[in-house]
Amino acid sequence: MMTATEIRQSFLDFFREKQHTVVPSASLMPQSPGLLFTNAGMNQFVPYFLGVWTPPWTPARATDTQKCIRAGGKHNDLEDVGYDSYHHTFFEMLGNWSFGDYFKREAIRWAWELVVERWGFPAERLYATVYAPDKSKGDPGEFDREAWDFWAELFRSRGLDPDVHIVHGNVKDNFWMMGETGPCGPCSELHVDLTPEGNTKGSLVNKDSDQCIEIWNLVFIQYNAESDGSMRNLPACHVDTGMGFERACSIMQCTNGFKDFSRKPSNYATDVFRPLFDRLEVLSGRKYADVYPAPGSKRVDAEDGTLQEAIAFRVIADHLRTLSFSIADGILPGNNGRNYVLRRILRRAVRYGRRLGFTQPFLAELVDTLVESFGQVFPELAARATTVKEVLNREEASFNETLDRGLELFDAETASAGKVSGEFAFKLYDTYGFPIDLTALLAEERGLDIDMERFNRLMEEQRERARAARKSEVVRALDLKTDAVTEFTGYDVDECAATVLEVSRQGDSLFIITDKTPFYAEMGGQVSDAGLIEIGGESYHVMAVQQIGNARAHVVEARPGLEVKPGDRVHLSIDAERRRRIEAHHTATHLLHCALHQVVSPDAAQQGSFVSEDRLRFDFNSSAVSPDQLRLIEEKVNGWIEESLPVHCTERAYADVKGNAAIAQFFGDKYGDVVRVVQVGGCRDGLDGVSMEFCGGTHIANTKNIGLFKIKSEGAIASGVRRIEAMTGDAALEMIRQHVVAKSLEIAKAVEKIKEVNYELADMGLEQVPVPTIEGKPGLTALGASDIRTVNDSLARFDASVEHFKQTALDAEKKLKKARAGQSAAKADALLNEWLSDAPSSLIQVAEGAGELLQELLNGLKKRQYAGAAFLLCVDSSSLLLGAYCGKDAIADGLSAGDMIREVAALAGGKGGGRADQARGSAPQDADPQALAAAARNIING
């Protein structure tokens, strides 16, 4: 019986023998912006099918095993994982591909050869489907007679009746389309009868039966769907096939090499998952049993511990694969889009981990086992295993606290309820980060329903608020479409003449597309150029530039008198000074990326960037960056700037450089046959620079033109994602100047506070606090220094001086407070000695003083164990403060200090309160102290 590793390798070796090039799996970060994750083997090959790229292989054939995720979006298997034997969020798709080379005969013949002749599938258990359109329903294309004939020949060779073993399929199951228009064609699927008898004669094909499983889908791309609904034959036909790896392993291993069909195959009962289960058994002390709920049931008896634990084993193993491969490809758990899907998956795994007794992070303990099984096939997993563990530990630890709190709230909320309200489900999501599917899981475990209609309504209201908050005045060419092509000349020139190709109006803006332009469009994190467009002798400001397909639209205000039409000649000129500042920040971003790899970690992968004329922003995955690391990063970047390194921008054949680990390439990015390499330092054609990246942006010619590089801030923007903001040149100097000005204001405030304190200390006859002197305030020489160490040392001395001023001011205030307290204590002691000299049973007094005196008076009464009731008023220039005290005798008589304060303060429109023995309050400054004292006397005397 073949192992999973042997099955995968056998597939790839078979097609290598058929002159296919074995290509690596694409990243799980998809090329298409419409996809959350790479979800099919064909994703990375779409540009070849569309004719955008030329296949680099001779012959034009490829084979691979592709990492895929189906969770979130249109294809979402998340909720089914664990409850049956075949759903996964992560899976491998084995495939072979032909780009205008071979077609149906070879694809079908080779599929049969591999499955039947090499792997030994019983031919009598196989059923092929071919496309048979229902013309009465307007189905596209024609009956796939070619595929039928090829399959028939193979079945007959084994003495089998083609009319039994070839099943006609409808447009839903057997016709593939890339979109409403574009490449498309019929499919032919291969199904396996897994019933014990194996004689269903095709009756279970496409009937959603787990006893007749599709193992391979062959797609024949031969048409182009036109906008009028017609089908045009393509000049070159393609083959796109996909075989579920886990499914193939299940069929071969669970039947013991096709010898025993007595039990239903399960993807989880294979050596794809067994190593993870073994490790989980060790960690949890529980045993995995390959048992499942009744078909179609999502309700699991809470008393059935074995089944509960089996589901948990499967969920954790599946989700661990999804999380680990995604993180290795640079996709991290987060709060938006695919990142939030990953966070949901992780939190679901953690919740199921509780069923196995895990209350502390445990997922990272499974990573080494996963690497042992898959690290050779997917080397990126092994290379980034440490990062994967760090991210899992961090996310899991964070969510465990949330989960504990959420479970408490859920149990309290649902203790006496028969349903989970939409408001509560939304609160768990919005306040505590509970994904709705996790709340649904908790409800399911307790047999409760959720008011999803109300939850969805609250979610939509939140989205509406978010959309309203995001509205801006920035013009976007969202609704424009064009087939025009604009040549970008901005790498070489700052201005050029051009011909208008198209003009569109949206609101108060004109979108002018020209045949060429020096204007860079907003993309790749770089802002668009600004400048002027001269039309008919008049110049107009270009507000923005948008990329629309292969064209660039210049956004201009539609002013009265502005007339422009296709064919007009115009002159375009960018704001060159602004462009140079943008270029400086862009090149500095590349240097920052390089420095991060050297100082922090080679796994500090880019998660996003923004480059403008006055700042740069760079997001990357990492744990916290220390101050020492930040200083070293600054020194490295400024060191490269001081070296006056040339910046080379060259075009290269992608095939020549795609494997060069020294060139930064980004997960999920797809490149054409020719790529632009931006190299800082080294020889122009040597690929030996200190920094090398694929980049289509604009850059300076030499690092000396960057000027000073200074980091403004570094911090977390999401779990595991950090952000550095930095500035270069004049923008950096202005940032430092503003910092010095702001800190100087802090010094001025501190000095003013020290002087105020000293005035009072002088009045008290006490020693005053010395005012420090400013040391290290950066002058123009320091601010203009190119040596970042000089700048940072000067700033550090100045910042330390600022902190010294602020601390001196705090110490001065403490000294004054202590002095006041000492005076107040002495005064209070003297007053109480006077007031209590004849041992009165009650005490009502008015004194001049502030809050310190009132508190010392109350403290003194307590210290003297005064047994009666007291009401005290302290009056100064800015306040009227009230205090009440009740000793043991007064309390025994039913008096309460808190009640007394509340009642008396209310008479004057004030407020207050406290305990029965001691309370404080205040009244408006214009209140009559004697009237309040009289009111208190009435309360005390009853």
Curated annotation (Swiss-Prot):
Cofactor note: Binds 1 zinc ion per subunit.
Catalytic reactions on record: tRNA(Ala) + L-alanine + ATP = L-alanyl-tRNA(Ala) + AMP + diphosphate
EC number assigned by the record: 6.1.1.7
GO cellular component, one term: cytoplasm
UniProt xrefs under SUPFAM superfamilies: Class II aaRS and biotin synthetases, Putative anticodon-binding domain of alanyl-tRNA synthetase (AlaRS), ThrRS/AlaRS common domain, Translation proteins
Claim: Acetylation is one of the keywords in the record: no
Keywords, comma-separated and alphabetical: Aminoacyl-tRNA synthetase, ATP-binding, Cytoplasm, Ligase, Metal-binding, Nucleotide-binding, Protein biosynthesis, RNA-binding, tRNA-binding, Zinc
InterPro entries listed in its UniProt record: aa-tRNA-synth_II/BPL/LPL, Ala-tRNA-lgiase_IIc, Ala-tRNA-ligase_IIc_anticod-bd, Ala-tRNA-synth_IIc_core, Ala-tRNA-synth_IIc_N, Ala-tRNA_ligase, Ala_tRNA_ligase_euk/bac, Thr/Ala-tRNA-synth_IIc_edit
Molecular-function GO term, any one: zinc ion binding
EC class: ligase
SMART domains according to UniProt: tRNA_SAD (SM00863)
Cofactor: Zn(2+)
Cellular compartments annotated: Cytoplasm
Superkingdom as given in the UniProt entry: Bacteria
Positions of Zn(2+) binding: H586, H590, C695, H699
Gene3D superfamilies according to UniProt: 2.40.30.130, 3.10.310.40, Bira Bifunctional Protein, Domain 2, Threonyl-trna Synthetase, Chain A, domain 2
PROSITE patterns: AA_TRNA_LIGASE_II_ALA
Any GO BP annotation: alanyl-tRNA aminoacylation
Notes on the domains: Consists of three domains; the N-terminal catalytic domain, the editing domain and the C-terminal C-Ala domain. The editing domain removes incorrectly charged amino acids, while the C-Ala domain, along with tRNA(Ala), serves as a bridge to cooperatively bring together the editing and aminoacylation centers thus stimulating deacylation of misacylated tRNAs.
Task performed by this protein: Catalyzes the attachment of alanine to tRNA(Ala) in a two-step reaction: alanine is first activated by ATP to form Ala-AMP and then transferred to the acceptor end of tRNA(Ala). Also edits incorrectly charged Ser-tRNA(Ala) and Gly-tRNA(Ala) via its editing domain.
Family classification: Belongs to the class-II aminoacyl-tRNA synthetase family.
Protein name (Swiss-Prot/TrEMBL): Alanine--tRNA ligase
Organism (species): Akkermansia muciniphila (strain ATCC BAA-835 / DSM 22959 / JCM 33894 / BCRC 81048 / CCUG 64013 / CIP 107961 / Muc)
Upper classification of the organism: Bacteria, Pseudomonadati, Verrucomicrobiota, Verrucomicrobiia, Verrucomicrobiales
